[in-house]
Design a protein with these regions (language model features):
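Long, hydrophobic N-terminal alpha-helical segment
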Residues: 2-52, 57
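A generic local secondary-structure boundary/capping motif
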Residues: 20-21, 70, 92-94, 129-133
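Short gly/pro/ser/thr-enriched loop/turn and capping motifs at secondary-structure boundaries
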Residues: 39-41, 66-67, 110-113
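Short, hinge-like loop/turn segments at secondary-structure boundaries
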Residues: 49-51, 77, 120-121
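Ordered, amphipathic secondary-structure segments that act as subunit-interaction surfaces
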Residues: 61-106
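Glycine-rich, aromatic-bearing surface loops/beta-hairpins
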Residues: 96, 101-159
Length: 159
């Protein structure tokens, strides 16, 4: 199994907080974005790769390829941040045997059909139930925009 240091749900994927805070907090040298649609968009792939700091490799994979990649043996000094837009992607990985110590919830913006839990997190019923199933499987999910903020267990947001 690959060495995953940070697993984050954030619908903006790579942006200022990820680049300036999370990558500086952890010795991350590889970002794996898991998104089926984005994996087919070569222009956006180039944009995301350009947004990463020097020395940080960005890989964009669909769910199927990411599952296989994450199950491979770790490489020496490979430290991965997994980024996804929605919790369903991580639930599928968990069901396939990929493990996560914890999941950090960043931003999930407001959209039609989503309930707002705080100023940065909104989720529809399917996403909310997915959060509950992940938590019930034994993986905690914490809301935290940047590492300097206190983690908030999302059980509090869901109740």
């Amino acid at each position: 199994m690959k060495n995953i240091l940070v697993t984050r749900i954030d619908d903006r994927l790579i942006h200022g907080q990820v680049v300036t805070a999370w990558i500086k907090q952890y010795p991350i040298n590889k970002i794996l974005i898991i998104d089926d649609e984005l994996s087919r968009n070569k222009l956006m792939e180039r944009i995301y790769k350009a947004a990463a700091p020097v020395g940080v490799e960005v890989m964009i994979m669909d769910q199927e390829h990411a599952e296989g990649f994450l199950k491979e043996p770790p490489l020496a000094k490979e430290h991965i941040m997994v980024l996804v837009k929605v919790p369903q992607v991580l639930e599928r990985l968990l069901q396939s045997g990929v493990g996560f110590n914890k999941i950090i919830l960043g931003g999930m913006g407001a959209k039609p059909g989503r309930k707002t839990f705080n100023k940065n997190v909104s989720a529809n019923e399917d996403e909310t139930e997915c959060f509950r199933r992940i938590i019930d499987s034994g993986v905690e999910i914490y809301y935290q925009l940047v590492p300097s903020e206190k983690e908030v267990n999302i059980r509090k947001l869901l109740s």
